Curated annotation (Swiss-Prot):
Family statement drawn from the similarity comment of this UniProt entry: Belongs to the LpxC family.
Lineage: Bacteria, Pseudomonadati, Spirochaetota, Spirochaetia, Leptospirales
The organism of origin for this protein: Leptospira biflexa serovar Patoc (strain Patoc 1 / ATCC 23582 / Paris)
Cofactor(s) the record lists: Zn(2+)
The name this protein goes by in its record: UDP-3-O-acyl-N-acetylglucosamine deacetylase
Biological role: Catalyzes the hydrolysis of UDP-3-O-myristoyl-N-acetylglucosamine to form UDP-3-O-myristoylglucosamine and acetate, the committed step in lipid A biosynthesis.
A Gene Ontology term for the protein's cellular component: membrane
Keywords, in A-Z order: Hydrolase, Lipid A biosynthesis, Lipid biosynthesis, Lipid metabolism, Metal-binding, Zinc
UniProt cross-references to PANTHER family, sorted A to Z: UDP-3-O-ACYL-N-ACETYLGLUCOSAMINE DEACETYLASE 1, MITOCHONDRIAL-RELATED
């Protein structure tokens, strides 16, 4: 017999502030309770404008560096996956996010501050229920030597492998079930990671201005710049965090065995679209990157 899952929102509003990883500016993010069936909705404040951008697959507009949603024009909110990983872990289905920048703050580079913030606000269980996504046949997406598979399972679990051209990141893998407790202790604290040469190249273009050892694991050609890691395999754990956050865009709890190799945001969202197409029987609108710059000169100056 399938366990009934109730929709959830937060009990009280909570404000989180942090640095935008690209702008280097302080970003304010406010989370508010919402009625059942509201879903997850961002309100982007730009001057006197208040722009509504729902969290849904049809609103994903770019996956090149992070997962970005938009309203169909130039308005968008990027780097939503760390927040959504925490939201999904705690079972939040209905919440309003007010934000004063085009990017969710990077915080410490993980989902932990969002998880702690939501827990501090309290969680309210709603009367309404929500049906989890389950599949009866394998679903997969492939891009060259990269792939992402979802197999039928009564629980959520993952087997993830990464293989970068780096002595510390060759063949790093991790397998685990993903219940709330395991996600909270073993996955959500894992920080984003990057290579020093890539960070320097981005900063030369006026991007990644908020990136630092305070919010990322940074790798040199032969080691880590950071004094210590939270886990020996923190990098692959963070990729699992990203995957959970990206699939949370589906807007429903999900179950299955996820098997990933060298995947990323684009494959994550492609799999989510395949899953929802099978579950609903409807073909979802294909997202199209408008190739909007991460920041315009005007936004970067704010």
């Amino acid at each position: 017999m399938q366990t009934v899952i109730h929709r959830k929102t937060i009990q009280n509003s909570v404000t989180l502030k942090g640095i935008g990883v690209h702008s280097g500016k302080v970003v304010t993010l406010r989370l508010h309770p919402a009625e059942a069936n509201t879903g997850l909705i961002f309100y982007l404040y730009k001057g006197i404008q208040k722009i509504r951008i729902p969290v849904s697959l049809d609103h994903v507009v770019d996956t090149s560096n992070a997962t970005t949603i938009g309203d169909g024009s130039s308005n968008r909110v990027q780097t939503i996956e760390h927040l959504l990983a925490a939201v999904h872990t705690l079972g939040i289905t209905d919440c309003i996010f007010e934000i004063d920048s085009v990017e969710v703050p990077i915080m410490d580079g993980s989902s932990l501050p969002f998880w702690e913030g939501i827990r501090s606000a309290g969680i309210r269980v709603l009367e309404e229920t929500i049906e989890p996504i389950t599949i009866t046949n394998p679903i997969w997406v492939v891009d060259g030597d990269k792939y992402l598979v979802m197999l039928p399972s009564d629980e959520l679990k993952v087997t993830y492998s990464i293989d970068f051209n780096h002595p510390l990141l060759r063949g790093q893998s991790y397998t685990t079930t993903l219940d709330e407790s395991i996600l909270g202790t073993d996955i959500l604290p894992a920080r984003t990671f990057g290579f020093l040469k890539d960070v320097e190249a981005l900063q030369a273009r006026g991007l990644a201005m908020g990136g630092s050892l305070d919010n990322a694991v940074v790798l040199t050609d032969d080691g880590y710049l950071n004094d210590h890691l939270r886990y020996d395999n923190e990098c692959v754990r963070h990729k699992i965090l990203d995957l959970v956050g990206d699939l949370a865009v589906m807007g429903r709890p999900f179950r299955g065995h996820l098997i990933a190799s060298k995947a990323g945001h684009a494959l994550d969202i492609s799999l989510a679209k395949c899953i929802m197409s099978q579950v609903t029987g409807n073909e979802l609108t294909q997202y199209k990157s408008k190739r909007i710059p991460l920041f315009s000169k005007k936004e970067a100056a704010k």
